[in-house]
Amino acid sequence: MKLAIKLAYRNLIGAGLRTWLNVIVLSFSFVVIIWMKGIMVGWDHQAKTDMKNWEIGGGQYWQENYDPFDPFTLSESHAAIPVSLNDEITNGEIVPSLIVSGTIYPQGRMQSVAIVGMNPHQSIFMLPTEKLDTTTSAIPAIIGSVSSRNLKLNVGDYVTIRWRNVNGMFDATEVVITGIFSCNVPSVDVGKIYIPLEKLREMMSLKGEATILTFREEQSERPEITGWSYKNTATLTQSVDELIQTKTVGQSIFYAILLLLAMLAIFDTQVLSIFRRQKEIGTYIALGYTRREVVGLFTVEGAMHSILAAIVSAIYGLPFLIWMAKSGWTMPIEASEFGMAMAQTLYPVYSAGLVISTVLIIVLVTTVVSYWPSRKIAKMNPTEALRGKLQ
């Protein structure tokens, strides 16, 4: 085996430009596949982290009628907070929020919004709710940067909001924008306006009630509470998992095409090599090599393309991958337009398992492709091969 590796290496280096063209193409596959997989892993990690910091915390209780995709359920999506959770709420380990449907009138225009009541002193979310603890002539409110852009509102602007209370009566008041935040989770930003929780309860005549109860830390088990539905972080981030899985399948097709082109070059090189080196093959057999050993020699020779490609890709790919991990890949279009948790700049994450699995898969595929044309050697007549007769 050691001799076969030495011979294979000598033959590859002796082939000159043909070898290095194959190696460069294959090394490009290494770098691109690892980078694109790293982008997907980084997006998954970043999206879930942002959702935990801005929206879901360590899990939630939803009022049983609440459906985030059906605004018509908001009028019934409220209930008294369970007494068993009062201690955790007092300690800041659970943050209650009340969500009601409303209408906002910026510059005389009308737009539907979800009015969210939030405790100004909460510390679970990264929302700047401390800006709700402000003394003003109107109700203090904060909105996201996308909502600010859509509604054409800035800090200090006054705007009218209208809502329908629990008794079915419509009412309206003015709010003043005391803060604008920027986040990567559209469901926290788009179509929502945040005001103090107690003020919203007073407006709606819903004292002590909430729509969502968010925990600071995730626990393996939470008690079942009548009228409330428990949602762990796995359930709340399921949409991200499904999206990443769909994107991964699409990327796999691209990986297959990229590998197919590289493997086609390897296959053609092997076929040409066997065709041109029939005398050499006959000489190996005459010197005592078995057909199996000669097939193994050519297979190792083809497989070594992937080893050399891994070395070459490490030379120029490692600095590129490190640079991308630090500076990130900025999306060419506004990420908020996708309607999902996605940062404008994605930072790839390269795990040891990702790199090792990619290298092993490419080496294995290259070995199989190299062996495929090498099987022809087993059918050759060594005498005819020594004479140089084409077979």
Task: List the model feature ranges, each with a label.
Residues 280-325, 357:
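Transmembrane alpha-helical interface segments in multi-pass membrane proteins
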Residues 97-100, 111-119, 130-197:
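Hydrophobic secondary-structure segments that place a key small or acidic residue at a functional site
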